[in-house]
């Protein structure tokens, strides 16, 4: 068995200021001839905006930031970094919530912000070819005159880029019916770590050979650098209507989700918020939410007017049977968007009631929603921190937002333990440690809970096939054996060590 990738690079923990300065000068000298002067940043005042992504609790100044403007420049930067054994972290809009774009102290942050052009919209084939830096929402805006749109819709769609969506396999509020990024992308084109062009998939509905496209989507920038994406477009529905359903008990709302799916109903959107989250967003956007409800469900139907009317009736009947106490049904498009505005602003609304928050991202079987909500309530007491809950309920994707003050080291520590507890509980209930935000650095230790050493070695094997020297986004996603052993040391429970079979270092 090959050892997991451990790049032979200067390690941040032992890097002296002088050694870092020498390395920086070497990298700047190598990259300066390859990109315009304004596209290479290394002074602290210029690189500080890149010191984190949406996970602001973790920060690291990059060695150098490169902002290439052409594909040839991207290839040249990658070739130079490969020659010098310099780590490369590709970056889109920096909206990721797991630290996937956290810089490497001795690496180059490769910003793809300049690759923001829509190459073509093809209404006949219902596809769009876009560069990696194009915003998610911009694709739908460009396709709108043709009566089409791009279905995956993360909450950050006004800012996040399609390249980042590919890296994380992003979903959104309508993924239950329309799928994740992997279900809506036909082709990805970019470069290998060596700067060689590579293409996965095709513009046809199927591509010959192994399905490497599915491996690249969701690989968090560890296998290749994406520059261009061909996405599927879908017709705008004739009509869409949303239901706000109130529940006097959070667990009843969880049971209602399972009941809807069990009844054979596939809503266009199915989202859930608990009372603390509802209060936060209602104060922020005035979406018309029931502030007395312990939880609300936003359930959407789309299609022809006849289909929507019939499905809305079925949805109401199922949720009423499950214990819903009140219903509000959108009367027009403006009211439907108003209902959704609260859900789409859940994160900024949380930022108004707490100095900081950490958004978790795990998945569980839908039938376990009620149980995980009860467990999270118990954890709030255990760790002495508040938590606002919002879920992509239809596919069991949880987004608990743990509220804390990052200026208080003890609160940050308790927040991290709280988050790890949520992830471990999700796995115990038959779920996973991540849904759509990725692993990044945030969930590295939790990967030790879900995957065995043999399974993690298979992941390293795939990484080695694409990136033998481990230079693309190193230290992310896949924990090493020693990392899992150290994680086991941190979580002694009743005198018993998890992962007792692993050597302790």
Residue ranges and their predicted role:
Residues 81, 221, 467:
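Conserved, mostly hydrophobic/aromatic
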Residues 98-116, 144-148, 171-182, 229-235, ...:
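A glycine- and small-aliphatic-rich helix-loop capping segment at beta-alpha/alpha-beta transitions
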Residues 117-271, 472, 488-493, 499-505:
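FAD-binding subdomain of flavoenzyme oxidoreductases
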Residues 196, 445-505:
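Activity-critical C-terminal alpha-helical subdomain
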């Amino acid at each position: 068995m090959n050892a997991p990738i451990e790049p032979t690079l200067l390690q941040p923990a032992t890097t002296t200021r002088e050694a870092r300065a020498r390395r920086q000068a070497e990298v700047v000298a190598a990259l300066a001839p390859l990109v315009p002067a304004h596209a290479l940043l290394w002074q602290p005042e210029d690189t500080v905006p890149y010191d984190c992504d949406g996970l602001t609790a973790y920060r690291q100044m990059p060695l150098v930031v490169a902002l290439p403007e052409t594909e040839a420049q991207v290839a040249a930067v990658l070739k130079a970094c490969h020659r010098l054994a310099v780590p490369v972290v590709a970056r889109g809009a920096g909206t990721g919530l797991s630290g996937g774009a956290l810089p490497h102290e001795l690496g180059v942050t490769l910003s793809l912000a300049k690759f923001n052009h829509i190459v073509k919209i093809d209404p006949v084939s219902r596809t769009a070819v876009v560069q990696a830096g194009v915003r998610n929402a911009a694709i739908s805006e460009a396709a709108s005159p043709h009566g089409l749109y791009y279905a995956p819709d993360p909450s950050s769609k006004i800012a996040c880029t399609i390249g980042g969506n590919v890296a994380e396999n992003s979903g959104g509020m309508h993924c239950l019916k329309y799928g994740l990024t992997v279900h809506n992308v036909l082709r990805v084109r970019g470069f290998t770590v060596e700067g060689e062009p590579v293409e996965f998939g095709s513009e046809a509905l199927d591509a010959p050979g192994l399905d490497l496209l599915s491996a690249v989507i969701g690989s968090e920038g560890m296998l290749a650098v994406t520059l261009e994406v061909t996405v599927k477009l879908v017709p705008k529905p004739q009509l869409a209507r949303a239901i706000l359903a109130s529940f006097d008990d959070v667990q009843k709302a969880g049971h209602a989700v399972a009941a809807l799916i069990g009844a054979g109903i596939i809503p266009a959107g199915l989202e859930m918020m608990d009372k603390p989250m509802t209060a936060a967003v209602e104060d922020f956007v005035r979406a018309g939410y029931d502030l007395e409800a312990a939880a609300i469900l936003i359930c959407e139907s789309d299609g022809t007017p006849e289909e929507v009317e019939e499905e809305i009736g079925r949805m109401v009947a199922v949720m009423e049977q499950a214990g819903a106490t009140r219903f509000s049904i959108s009367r027009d498009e403006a009211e439907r968007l108003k209902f959704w505005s609260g859900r789409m602003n859940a994160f900024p609304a949380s930022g108004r009631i707490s100095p900081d928050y950490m958004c978790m991202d795990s998945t569980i079987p839908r039938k376990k929603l009620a149980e995980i909500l009860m467990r999270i309530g118990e954890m709030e007491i255990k760790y002495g921190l508040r938590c606002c809950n919002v879920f992509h309920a239809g596919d069991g994707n949880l987004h608990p937002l743990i509220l804390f003050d990052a200026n208080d080291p003890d609160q940050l520590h308790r927040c991290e333990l709280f988050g790890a507890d949520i992830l471990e509980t999700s796995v115990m209930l038959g779920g996973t440690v991540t849904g759509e935000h990725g692993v990044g650095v945030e969930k590295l230790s939790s990967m030790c809970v879900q995957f065995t050493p043999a399974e993690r070695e298979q992941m390293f094997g795939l990484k080695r096939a694409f990136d033998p020297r481990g230079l693309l986004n190193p230290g992310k996603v896949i924990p090493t054996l020693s990392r899992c052993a150290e994680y086991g040391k941190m979580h002694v429970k009743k005198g018993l060590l998890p992962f007792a079979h692993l050597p302790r270092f």
